[in-house]
Amino acid sequence: MDSFTIQKSTKILKNLDAKIEDYTIINQRNDSLKVDTSLTIEKFYKLNYLRSDNFELIEFSNTGHTYNSLSFVESKGLFPQIGSNAKHYNYLKTNDINYYHVATPFTELMYRSAFVQGQLLDALFSVNTSPRFNFTIARKGLRSLGNYQHFLSSSSNFRFSTNYNSRNSKYFLKTHYVNQNLFSEENGGIREDDISNFESGNTEFIDRSVFDPQFENADNTLHGKRFYLNQNYLIKNSLDSLNTRKWSVGNIITLENKYYQFKQSTSNEYFGESTGFNQINDKVSFDTFLVNFNTSFSSSKLGMTTFFMNYRDVNYNYESIIDENFSFGLNYLFKKENYILDFQFESMLTGDVEGSLIKAGLLLNINSDSNIKFEKNTQRFKCTNSH
């Protein structure tokens, strides 16, 4: 009997305490994690702007700006992205959104101060209106003035997610909406004649705001909105003592719009001489629409195999548009206690893009705190036409 058990009189059973096992976080791969309320060193390392261990990242002088990465993670796909990767460290992608199943209303708050009149707050509220339906609303907000002139950063990550499963446990739905705005002022760094004072250690220059920057009239913004829907229907579910076999069909719809914009009221020769214009206002948009149809076969002995067909429409909103691309492929996932094996293949069928993508990975769990991952990516890509 769990914390959702209800008497026939529709009254909730009294003196039935919710257990920590009744609070579950579900990721995009349907892996379930129990909510962890313990206070550990690992949790301390995640008490930051990215809400993750940033051991391999060197933060800039103000929270909310970019990072210098000391590691290299190769990421390949069949389609080029918008670029502006330096602004994407805090941009929540589809795989970053979690779903919840909770026995009672659940709240999580994270607060820490930032640089000079700076505050960072991440708030999440989740509730199950019934054992089968949950909705979660969350927002992370930052505003940090920074130690240097004209280096303010401000960001907002709003997300709303729901998940539902039918009474007969055959239909499953996950959906989310996110709205993100990442803004930062740019100053080009301090001037060359201030470098000696910066490095001197003189107490007169401990206050970094005394240094004059290269310019004080530039800023950039990354803004994005995404709607995501993932639904599955379980056609067959065979259970026995030795093997569990399932067959399901599914559909995924993703609609995302994002843009990156850099503005400077008057151009500056620090980056080189500009010709033909005095004011800079560069903006590029990136719209994507994805429809996925898939069918999955899973077995506790053989793992899960998924065959899929994708339709993509990608619009860069300037001279080049890539549209009406169809692709097909398969995913394979096999999990055991000590390792996880995954394989992905996707190839284009029609459209302006020709190519294929192969990914293979092996994750070895050494112990509860350590793991090793091996991954190999192979990509073939060619754009045959642009208009």
Indicate residue ranges for each PLM-predicted region.
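Residues on the lipid-exposed face of transmembrane beta-strands in outer-membrane beta-barrel proteins
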Residues: 123-127, 137, 160-164, 229-235, ...
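Hydrophobic, lipid-facing positions within transmembrane beta-strands of outer-membrane proteins
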Residues: 105, 119-123, 156-160, 225-229, ...
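Membrane-embedded beta-strand positions of outer-membrane beta-barrel proteins
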Residues: 109, 137, 162, 173-175, ...
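Outer-membrane beta-barrel translocator/receptor signature
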Residues: 91, 100-107, 113-147, 152-158, ...
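Short loop/turn motifs that connect adjacent beta-strands in outer-membrane beta-barrel proteins
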Residues: 97-104, 131-132, 167-173, 236-247, ...
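Transmembrane beta-strand segments that form the barrel wall of outer-membrane beta-barrel proteins
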Residues: 104-113, 135-147, 309-315, 337-351, ...
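Solvent-exposed loop/turn segments connecting transmembrane beta-strands
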Residues: 86-87, 111-120, 145-153, 317-326, ...
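Outer-membrane beta-barrel translocator/channel fold
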Residues: 53-56, 79-82, 145-157, 161-223, ...
